[in-house]
Amino acid sequence: LAVVDGEAARDCLRPTSRVAISPDDYEYDVDLCNALRRGLLRVERLSDLEVQTGVWRLRPDQPGVADLLLAGKGYPRQFVRWNEYAIPIPAAMHQAFQGEPGVEVSQDGRWLSVFAPLPDSLDDIVGVLELCVSLRGELPPVL
Protein backbone atom coordinates (compact mmCIF):
# COMPACT_ATOMS: atom_id res chain seq x y z
CA LEU A 1 0.00 0.00 0.00
CA ALA A 2 2.99 2.30 0.16
CA VAL A 3 2.44 3.25 -3.49
CA VAL A 4 -1.20 4.30 -2.96
CA ASP A 5 -1.41 7.64 -1.16
CA GLY A 6 -4.02 7.72 1.62
CA GLU A 7 -3.95 11.51 1.84
CA ALA A 8 -4.65 11.78 -1.89
CA ALA A 9 -7.55 9.33 -1.50
CA ARG A 10 -8.95 11.36 1.38
CA ASP A 11 -8.60 14.77 -0.24
CA CYS A 12 -8.87 14.28 -4.02
CA LEU A 13 -12.65 14.70 -3.97
CA ARG A 14 -13.49 18.34 -3.29
CA PRO A 15 -15.71 18.93 -0.21
CA THR A 16 -18.66 20.16 -2.27
CA SER A 17 -18.69 16.85 -4.17
CA ARG A 18 -18.37 14.44 -1.26
CA VAL A 19 -22.14 14.05 -1.15
CA ALA A 20 -23.25 13.59 -4.73
CA ILE A 21 -26.12 12.17 -6.72
CA SER A 22 -23.96 10.52 -9.36
CA PRO A 23 -20.27 10.21 -10.27
CA ASP A 24 -20.86 12.83 -12.97
CA ASP A 25 -21.32 15.39 -10.19
CA TYR A 26 -17.87 14.82 -8.70
CA GLU A 27 -15.32 17.60 -8.68
CA TYR A 28 -11.76 16.37 -8.17
CA ASP A 29 -8.51 18.03 -7.19
CA VAL A 30 -6.65 17.14 -10.37
CA ASP A 31 -3.18 16.89 -8.83
CA LEU A 32 -4.30 14.63 -5.97
CA CYS A 33 -6.44 12.56 -8.32
CA ASN A 34 -3.47 12.05 -10.64
CA ALA A 35 -1.25 11.03 -7.71
CA LEU A 36 -3.81 8.47 -6.59
CA ARG A 37 -4.32 7.16 -10.11
CA ARG A 38 -0.55 6.78 -10.62
CA GLY A 39 -0.43 4.65 -7.47
CA LEU A 40 -3.26 2.43 -8.72
CA LEU A 41 -1.61 2.00 -12.11
CA ARG A 42 1.70 1.16 -10.42
CA VAL A 43 0.01 -1.59 -8.38
CA GLU A 44 -1.50 -3.00 -11.58
CA ARG A 45 1.89 -3.01 -13.33
CA LEU A 46 3.65 -4.64 -10.36
CA SER A 47 1.28 -7.60 -10.39
CA ASP A 48 1.97 -10.74 -12.41
CA LEU A 49 -1.81 -11.10 -12.81
CA GLU A 50 -4.28 -9.06 -14.88
CA VAL A 51 -5.44 -7.15 -11.81
CA GLN A 52 -7.91 -4.27 -11.72
CA THR A 53 -7.63 -1.73 -8.92
CA GLY A 54 -9.97 0.77 -7.38
CA VAL A 55 -10.43 2.90 -4.27
CA TRP A 56 -13.78 2.87 -2.51
CA ARG A 57 -15.05 5.45 -0.04
CA LEU A 58 -17.95 5.42 2.40
CA ARG A 59 -20.89 7.59 1.38
CA PRO A 60 -21.42 10.12 4.20
CA ASP A 61 -25.03 10.63 3.10
CA GLN A 62 -25.91 6.91 2.81
CA PRO A 63 -24.89 4.63 5.70
CA GLY A 64 -23.95 1.15 4.54
CA VAL A 65 -23.12 2.34 1.02
CA ALA A 66 -19.72 2.82 -0.63
CA ASP A 67 -18.88 4.26 -4.00
CA LEU A 68 -15.95 3.92 -6.34
CA LEU A 69 -13.77 6.98 -5.90
CA LEU A 70 -11.24 6.14 -8.60
CA ALA A 71 -10.14 3.14 -10.66
CA GLY A 72 -6.86 2.19 -12.28
CA LYS A 73 -6.90 1.31 -15.97
CA GLY A 74 -10.23 -0.55 -15.75
CA TYR A 75 -13.12 -0.76 -13.32
CA PRO A 76 -12.96 -3.59 -10.77
CA ARG A 77 -15.46 -5.95 -12.39
CA GLN A 78 -16.91 -7.82 -9.43
CA PHE A 79 -18.94 -4.95 -7.96
CA VAL A 80 -19.05 -2.14 -10.53
CA ARG A 81 -21.80 -2.26 -13.13
CA TRP A 82 -22.71 0.26 -15.80
CA ASN A 83 -24.03 3.35 -14.02
CA GLU A 84 -23.89 1.62 -10.61
CA TYR A 85 -20.93 3.07 -8.76
CA ALA A 86 -22.55 3.27 -5.32
CA ILE A 87 -23.15 -0.18 -3.86
CA PRO A 88 -24.23 -1.75 -0.56
CA ILE A 89 -21.01 -2.57 1.26
CA PRO A 90 -20.09 -6.27 0.86
CA ALA A 91 -18.89 -8.08 3.99
CA ALA A 92 -15.23 -8.22 2.89
CA MET A 93 -15.20 -4.50 2.07
CA HIS A 94 -16.83 -3.71 5.42
CA GLN A 95 -14.06 -5.70 7.11
CA ALA A 96 -11.47 -3.53 5.32
CA PHE A 97 -13.24 -0.32 6.37
CA GLN A 98 -12.87 -1.67 9.94
CA GLY A 99 -9.09 -2.06 9.46
CA GLU A 100 -8.72 -5.73 8.47
CA PRO A 101 -8.15 -7.04 4.92
CA GLY A 102 -10.98 -9.02 3.37
CA VAL A 103 -11.45 -11.38 0.42
CA GLU A 104 -14.57 -12.09 -1.60
CA VAL A 105 -15.21 -14.43 -4.54
CA SER A 106 -18.16 -13.66 -6.81
CA GLN A 107 -21.16 -15.98 -6.61
CA ASP A 108 -20.48 -17.30 -10.11
CA GLY A 109 -16.81 -17.95 -9.26
CA ARG A 110 -15.50 -15.61 -11.98
CA TRP A 111 -13.92 -12.86 -9.85
CA LEU A 112 -11.77 -12.63 -6.75
CA SER A 113 -11.50 -9.31 -4.92
CA VAL A 114 -9.07 -8.52 -2.14
CA PHE A 115 -9.89 -5.46 -0.04
CA ALA A 116 -7.24 -3.64 1.99
CA PRO A 117 -7.75 -0.71 4.35
CA LEU A 118 -6.26 2.51 3.00
CA PRO A 119 -4.94 4.60 5.91
CA ASP A 120 -3.74 8.18 5.89
CA SER A 121 -0.64 9.32 7.79
CA LEU A 122 -2.62 9.33 11.07
CA ASP A 123 -3.68 5.70 10.49
CA ASP A 124 -7.32 6.71 9.98
CA ILE A 125 -8.98 4.46 7.39
CA VAL A 126 -9.91 6.88 4.58
CA GLY A 127 -10.85 4.32 1.96
CA VAL A 128 -10.50 0.75 0.80
CA LEU A 129 -8.21 -0.47 -1.96
CA GLU A 130 -9.72 -3.24 -4.09
CA LEU A 131 -7.63 -5.58 -6.20
CA CYS A 132 -9.85 -7.65 -8.48
CA VAL A 133 -8.69 -10.51 -10.69
CA SER A 134 -10.51 -12.85 -13.05
CA LEU A 135 -10.40 -16.49 -12.02
CA ARG A 136 -11.12 -17.55 -15.60
CA GLY A 137 -8.45 -15.63 -17.46
CA GLU A 138 -10.80 -12.95 -18.81
CA LEU A 139 -9.13 -9.69 -19.71
CA PRO A 140 -10.51 -6.49 -18.21
CA PRO A 141 -11.66 -3.68 -20.49
CA VAL A 142 -9.31 -0.73 -20.85
CA LEU A 143 -10.80 2.66 -20.03
Protein language model features and the residues they cover:
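Short N-terminal helix-loop-first-beta-strand/juxtamembrane motif that initiates sensory/input modules
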Residues: 41-65
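Helix-start (N-cap) segments at beta->loop->alpha junctions
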Residues: 131-143
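Short hydrophobic/glycine-rich mini-motifs in sensory/regulatory modules
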Residues: 119-129
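Extracellular/periplasmic ligand-binding regions of membrane signal-transduction receptors
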Residues: 1-33
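Extracytoplasmic/secreted envelope proteins and their assembly/folding machinery
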Residues: 37-41, 115
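Envelope-exposed proteins and targeting segments
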Residues: 49-51, 109, 127
